[in-house]
Amino acid sequence: MRTVSTVAELRAALPREGVGFVPTMGYLHRGHLALVERARRENPFVVVSVFVNPLQFGPGEDYHRYPRDLERDRALLQEAGVDLLFAPGVEEMYPEGFATRVQVEGPLTALWEGAVRPGHFQGVATVVARLFLLVQPQRAYFGEKDYQQLLVVRRMVRDLGFPVEVVGVPTVREEDGLALSSRNVYLSPETRKKAPVLYRALLAMREVAGQGGSVAEALRAGEEALRAVPEFRKDYLAIVHPETLLPLSDWVAGARGIVAGRFPEARLIDNLEVYP
């Protein structure tokens, strides 16, 4: 595996076609490696980027303390069979005078994470667009754990005509259901035991749906599950359309349960298909 940190080195190292791309912010875990494994199976050449993107963090968020360990990441990617690691600095990605932003409009970015974290998806769309232009992948891999982000990237790709297939990969979970996240490292041992409450709320909603209950009944079951852990401060719990993310009052195929909120040490999000 080769590691490069500049745009010039990246361009010199890329093949002309057959690139599968996994953009990350580093501090890799099994969820990231599932993306890499899928990319490795489906593409002759695999590129991974590690870049903690300042544009997607708001004031008071965890940009400066976001976990970083490039040497550990490099070892994991080498073992996973990655061909090229692109690990640029901020100045390389956003040179002095960089003034362009990419904005996906509408409910996809206005609701849920977009409402709680203003400007977040503009930062995501900007960095992903720049990375796509630099790496020129045929396929790019994103985890379903960040489901709203996946839909935003797909919309940007459709609207701007990027010749990239955006592949969603199912969420990887711990044995107790907690979705893997680099931010889980923030959790104290006591909070870690309580963190699967997000997944339990989603399962409760799916169970009600499976028994023929209404959307309203499913939401009540999810809320009840969350109340069992008073330390968790909910930002939102909803059942939404799987493509528009608009809240539902009646079931549709693929309806998605989404949940987010804060523990004292960290903010967590999760989602699950609750109606097949």
Swiss-Prot record:
GO terms for molecular function: ATP binding; pantoate-beta-alanine ligase activity. Keywords: ATP-binding, Cytoplasm, Ligase, Nucleotide-binding, Pantothenate biosynthesis. It catalyses: (R)-pantoate + beta-alanine + ATP = (R)-pantothenate + AMP + diphosphate + H(+). (R)-pantoate binds at residues 56, 149. The keyword Repeat does not apply. Its EC number is 6.3.2.1. GO terms for biological process: pantothenate biosynthetic process. Pathway: Cofactor biosynthesis; (R)-pantothenate biosynthesis; (R)-pantothenate from (R)-pantoate and beta-alanine: step 1/1. Pfam families: Pantoate_ligase. It is found in: Cytoplasm. Beta-alanine binds at residue 56. Transmembrane segments: none annotated. GO terms for cellular component: cytosol. ATP binds at residues 25-32, 143-146, 172, 180-183. The active site is at residue 32. Belongs to the pantothenate synthetase family. Homodimer. The reaction proceeds by a bi uni uni bi ping pong mechanism. PDB 1UFV apparently has a Val-49-Ala mutation. Catalyzes the condensation of pantoate with beta-alanine in an ATP-dependent reaction via a pantoyl-adenylate intermediate. This is Pantothenate synthetase. It comes from Thermus thermophilus (strain ATCC 27634 / DSM 579 / HB8).
